[in-house]
């Protein structure tokens, strides 16, 4: 049995200092029934907690660390930038370099604005869509999480799903009434919403792959249908690629599925592990953002040199060949997890998109939030705790996916499959 004495003591102290002892709810490990692990360091595919335990990491800071922990090039870039100054409140050339890379690789982006988080990106994109169209309502999908902005924290997934809260208290009714929610992967519901409110729907915002109800890819024709419906009704299509951006493919989710939105939100990978976000799209739309246009958005640390340098060094290391290797590794892990579950008669359903993998403990195919909620949460919690004992660090929620990095080796994946085999053999009915 692993020892967690230092993590337990640190969490006891933290609960007097921060709400619930953490700075983001899912980190409290509530849904898996254990004390959170306090991490001390990471290198490559491994993390080490303050008690000295080593884990193969599939959290990767919730997705940003596509090259694993403490990537040499990212670390050197950060050292170099920090020595010259961390922020100036003035433009820097590194902003241009990262912006060029993003514009080159993301099909929908002709102009991009850097911000400090994915939440900032989605909130700003919604304001832009409303300002550009002159309409008020937005359409989102049940279980899709787009950050904690009031307009979007309605029937969201992620930590909200884990805590069993459909919404958050504190969201005014006046805000909520302008957010239409329909089931993910249900194109007919989208069409019906446009029949009812089409003249006032500014945009549809969607994750190309839903990542906060677990990993739920789009059904064939779903994204194409959204593109068609929005174009027919004069609404904008926004892809929230904070999670999928540069993770599922070299050209992001929109390149992977061949559907180009009007606006795209980015985060996570483009910051290389530092706080970052971005939104961009067609030049005609983006030129409405201040100071080019009247739609205001600003940020003290937006485009700061540290985040830009980390993001640039992260993206330049990604090539089309990187994603071929991601596909191979992810297929290997998916097949191994499936084989272990089948061997022990564990009800399960595995979804995957590129290097994102979700395993649900249910017999039901998971294509939307209702199906995801059919998962056996008690079994997941027990499985999670056993995987920790086996030295594998997974996201502590059934409603989050696993992430792979370029640092994960075949040996890491084989060890993870072996750990899952042991865990499932102990937990089978």
UniProtKB/Swiss-Prot annotation:
The Gene Ontology biological process annotation of the record reads: protoporphyrinogen IX biosynthetic process
Q: Which cofactor does it need?
A: pyridoxal 5'-phosphate
What are the UniProt keywords, alphabetically? Answer: Cytoplasm, Isomerase, Porphyrin biosynthesis, Pyridoxal phosphate
Q: Which CDD domains match?
A: OAT_like
- What is the reaction catalyzed? (S)-4-amino-5-oxopentanoate = 5-aminolevulinate
E.C. number: 5.4.3.8
Q: Name one GO cellular component term.
A: cytoplasm
Where is this gene product found? Cytoplasm
- Name any one GO molecular function: pyridoxal phosphate binding
Named in its record, the pathway it takes part in is: Porphyrin-containing compound metabolism; protoporphyrin-IX biosynthesis; 5-aminolevulinate from L-glutamyl-tRNA(Glu): step 2/2
Cross-referenced Gene3D superfamilies? Aspartate Aminotransferase, domain 1, Type I PLP-dependent aspartate aminotransferase-like (Major domain)
Q: What class of enzyme is it?
A: isomerase
Where is this protein chiefly located?
cytoplasm
Q: Pfam families, per this entry?
A: Aminotran_3 (PF00202)
* Subunit structure as annotated in this protein's UniProt entry: Homodimer.
Q: Which family does it belong to?
A: Belongs to the class-III pyridoxal-phosphate-dependent aminotransferase family. HemL subfamily.
Family matches, as NCBIfam families: hemL, PRK00062.1
Protein name stated in the entry = Glutamate-1-semialdehyde 2,1-aminomutase 2
Q: Which organism is it from?
A: Bacillus cereus (strain ATCC 14579 / DSM 31 / CCUG 7414 / JCM 2152 / NBRC 15305 / NCIMB 9373 / NCTC 2599 / NRRL B-3711)
């Amino acid at each position: 049995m692993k020892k967690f004495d230092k993590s337990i003591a640190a969490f006891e102290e933290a609960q007097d200092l921060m709400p619930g002892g953490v700075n983001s709810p899912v980190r409290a490990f509530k849904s898996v029934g254990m004390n959170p692990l306090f991490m001390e360091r990471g290198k490559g595919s491994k993390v080490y907690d303050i008690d000295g335990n080593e884990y193969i990491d599939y959290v990767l800071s919730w997705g940003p660390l596509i090259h694993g922990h403490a990537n040499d090039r990212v670390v050197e870039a950060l050292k170099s930038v920090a020595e010259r100054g961390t922020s100036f409140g003035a433009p820097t050339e590194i902003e241009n370099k990262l912006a060029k890379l993003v514009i080159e690789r993301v099909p929908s982006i002709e102009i991009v604005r850097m911000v400090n988080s994915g939440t900032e990106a989605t909130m700003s994109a919604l304001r832009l869509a409303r300002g550009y169209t002159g309409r008020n309502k937005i359409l989102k999908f049940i279980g899709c999480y787009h950050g904690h902005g009031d307009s979007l924290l309605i029937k969201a997934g992620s930590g909200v799903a884990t805590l069993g809260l459909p919404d958050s208290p504190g969201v005014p009714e006046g805000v909520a009434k302008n957010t239409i929610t329909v089931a993910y992967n249900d194109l007919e519901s989208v069409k019906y919403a446009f029949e009812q409110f089409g003249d006032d729907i500014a945009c549809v915002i969607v994750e190309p792959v839903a990542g906060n109800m677990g990993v739920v890819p789009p059904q064939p024709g779903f994204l194409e249908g959204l593109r068609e419906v929005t174009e027919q009704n004069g609404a904008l299509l926004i892809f929230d690629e904070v999670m999928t951006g540069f993770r599922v493919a070299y050209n992001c989710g929109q390149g992977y599925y061949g559907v180009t939105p009007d606006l795209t939100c980015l985060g996570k990978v483009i910051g290389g592990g530092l706080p970052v976000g971005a939104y961009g799209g067609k030049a005609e739309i983006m030129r409405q953002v201040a100071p080019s246009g009247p739609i205001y958005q600003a940020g003290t640390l937006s485009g700061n040199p540290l985040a830009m340098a980390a993001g640039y060094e992260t993206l330049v290391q990604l090539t089309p060949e990187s994603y071929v290797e991601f596909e191979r590794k992810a297929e290997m892990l998916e097949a191994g997890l499936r084989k272990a579950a089948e061997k022990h008669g564990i009800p399960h359903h595995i979804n995957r998109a590129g290097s994102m993998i979700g395993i649900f403990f249910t017999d039901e195919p998971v294509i939307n939030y209702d199906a995801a909620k059919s998962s056996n949460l008690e079994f997941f919690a027990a499985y999670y705790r056993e995987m920790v004992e086996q030295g594998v660090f997974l996201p502590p929620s059934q409603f989050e996916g696993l992430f792979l990095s370029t640092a994960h080796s075949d040996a890491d994946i084989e060890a993870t499959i072996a750990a899952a085999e042991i865990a499932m053999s102990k937990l089978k009915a």
